[in-house]
């Protein structure tokens, strides 16, 4: 028996919700923008194979790979429930660039833990599994946060709550929005992007941030796409992180002139997202970004929609 799980790319923060909002996205042309993990019966407790277009960026020692840590914490949780871990062989297909702002580590974590859970007939419930995913993400970025793993696992636009045992809940969004994702092909480390942020904020920035986030969530729930798009503004991170992203200011300016509703940094960058109301605008923005924002052959641009499914079982073979 084998199980393969695909976990999609995600946009952390979505500009307006620093560390509390995240959205899963999938290209409209059917390209798999995300990682896949296969788990099948093995002869030893754990063995790892790696594949995929970004396999060269992974550590050569399997024990340094985050999916090995996923296996360890999954084993810990099974032990607490008095359940036995099956000997298994895992294959990670790494299709996501590392340090891209597309939730690359979240893709590997979500695909690995979901596949492990499926392979063992789902002993952990959704929130237990999500808590483990946040723990693993924290191991990479230095603090537990869910704004990539929650949408990657659950799909859609997710708001982090962390109250009453609820880690996150889905916010209704606009299915007709196109999300143009542009990765320039350079790397920005999450730790560096966090270090650049101020330790304190001015009162007017805190008030503006609260107004934007509350306004955005209100507009999503009341079905006002124009208002929602206007509220996608970031006073917390983007003003400081722009300097890490060559060409971002020009890209945002062009996207607005071409008719995009909003443009922002995906996670800590360097990927940007641009929301467009119709496909013509999305294609125009995508073409410009391909010619002006992408810096090398590793970069790419995809026109996406919100991915409402999150991680899914795609079968038993890679």
From Swiss-Prot:
Main location: cytoplasm
Parts forming coiled coils: none
Sorted UniProt keywords: Amino-acid biosynthesis, ATP-binding, Cytoplasm, Kinase, Nucleotide-binding, Threonine biosynthesis, Transferase
Pfam families: GHMP_kinases_C, GHMP_kinases_N
Pathway entry: Amino-acid biosynthesis; L-threonine biosynthesis; L-threonine from L-aspartate: step 4/5
Residues of the signal peptide: none
Keyword Kinase in record: yes
Gene3D superfamilies linked to this entry: 3.30.230.10, GHMP kinase, C-terminal domain
GO biological process: threonine biosynthetic process
InterPro entries assigned to the protein according to its UniProt record, in alphabetical order: GHMP_kinase_C_dom, GHMP_kinase_C_sf, GHMP_kinase_N_dom, GHMP_knse_ATP-bd_CS, Homoserine_kinase, Ribosomal_Su5_D2-typ_SF, Ribsml_uS5_D2-typ_fold_subgr
Cellular component GO terms held in the UniProt record: cytoplasm
Enzyme Commission code(s) on record: 2.7.1.39
Keyword DNA-binding: no
Superkingdom per UniProt: Bacteria
Subcellular location(s) per record: Cytoplasm
Catalytic reaction(s) noted: L-homoserine + ATP = O-phospho-L-homoserine + ADP + H(+)
GO molecular-function term, one example from the UniProt record: ATP binding
SUPFAM superfamilies for the chain: GHMP Kinase, C-terminal domain, Ribosomal protein S5 domain 2-like
Residues holding ATP: 97-107
Family the UniProt entry places it in: Belongs to the GHMP kinase family. Homoserine kinase subfamily.
NCBIfam families: PRK01212.1-4, thrB
Its biological purpose: Catalyzes the ATP-dependent phosphorylation of L-homoserine to L-homoserine phosphate.
UniProt-recorded name of the protein: Homoserine kinase
Annotated organism of origin: Vibrio vulnificus (strain YJ016)
Gene this chain is encoded by: thrB
């Amino acid at each position: 028996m084998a199980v393969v799980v695909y976990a999609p790319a995600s946009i952390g923060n979505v500009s307006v919700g620093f560390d509390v909002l995240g959205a899963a996205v999938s290209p409209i042309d059917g390209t798999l923008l995300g990682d896949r993990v296969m788990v099948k019966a093995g002869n030893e407790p754990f063995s790892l194979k790696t594949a995929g277009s970004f396999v060269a960026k992974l550590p050569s020692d399997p024990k340094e790979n985050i999916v090995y840590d996923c296996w360890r914490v999954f084993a810990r949780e099974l032990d607490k429930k008095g359940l036995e871990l099956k000997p298994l062989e895992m294959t990670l297909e790494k299709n996501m660039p590392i340090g891209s702002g597309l939730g690359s580590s979240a893709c590997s974590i979500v695909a690995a833990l979901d596949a492990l859970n499926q392979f063992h007939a789902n002993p952990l419930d959704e929130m237990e599994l999500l808590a483990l995913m946040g723990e693993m993400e924290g191991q990479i970025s230095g603090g537990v946060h869910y704004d990539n793993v929650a949408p990657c696992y659950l799909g859609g636009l997710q708001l982090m709550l962390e109250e009453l045992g609820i880690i996150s809940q889905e916010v209704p969004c606009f299915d007709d929005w196109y999300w143009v994702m542009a990765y320039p092909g350079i790397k920005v480390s999450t730790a560096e992007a966090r270090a650049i942020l101020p330790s304190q904020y001015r009162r007017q920035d805190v008030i503006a941030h609260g107004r934007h986030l509350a306004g955005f969530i209100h507009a999503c729930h009341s079905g006002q796409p124009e208002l929602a798009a206007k509220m996608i503004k970031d006073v917390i991170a983007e003003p400081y992180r722009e300097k890490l992203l060559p060409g971002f200011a020009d890209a945002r300016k062009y996207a607005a002139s071409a008719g995009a509703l909003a443009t922002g940094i995906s996670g800590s960058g360097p990927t940007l997202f641009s929301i467009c109301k119709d496909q013509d605008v999305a294609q125009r923005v995508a073409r410009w970004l391909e010619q002006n924002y992408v810096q090398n052959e590793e970069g790419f641009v995809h026109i996406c929609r919100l991915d409402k499914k999150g991680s899914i079982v795609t079968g038993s073979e890679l």
